[in-house]
Amino acid sequence: EEQARLKESPKSYVSSTGVSFRLLEPNYILMGAKRSEEGQRANEVIREVDLTKPFYLGTYEITNSNFMKFKAKNSKGEELISNEEPATNITWNDAALYCNWLSSKEGLQKFYQQIGNKIVGLNLTSNGYRLPTEAEWAWTARSSDKKGVKQIKFPWGNNKTVKQGSGNFADETSKGSVDQFIPNYKDGYSR
């Protein structure tokens, strides 16, 4: 039954609020890092996770303009004022409330149980929007769509040094508008 439902599911769709989603069919991921691995943290252990259910993930980050449809008074930060930039300064609770809001807009069951504006539990049988789990997020960042391709350590590859043009990171042009930036790095997305 699950396989039949998966075949009928669209590979991608756009929500009524304009957010695009893509269906992902994950499998196995090795999470964590070896003790000898550079950057390994004391609380990290290697664990195998088998992701058995497909899930939808937003194709892009939620933008300021989209998040402000839910919460008009969101602080975008002093310098990060473009409506099409990713929403920032959002708590986990607000992100979960956004998921519930989007679920309501789409006529779906809310995933997060809430009392007022506070998340107090989960509805695991819900068909509504939710944040990705840690394993889903790690699989998305570290895997390829190609079957049999080895997992990578970082979205840009296995080298700790970020490759030029790999993404819109806080490079030196962000100095003064963000708390942390990558020194001696230009990502090509200067503002």
Feature annotation, model-predicted:
Residues E1, K73, K153-F154:
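Extended, compositionally biased low-complexity polar/Lys-Gly-rich tracts
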Residues K11-E78, N83-S103, T140:
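A short glycine-rich, aromatic-capped structural motif
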Residues L30, K34-R35, I81, W92-R191:
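Functional-site microenvironments in short loops/helix caps that host divalent-cation chemistry
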Residues R5-L6, R41-A42, G188:
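Short solvent-exposed loop/turn micro-motifs enriched in small/polar/acidic residues
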Residues E1-P10:
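Pro/Ala/Gly-rich low-complexity, hydrophilic intrinsically disordered segments
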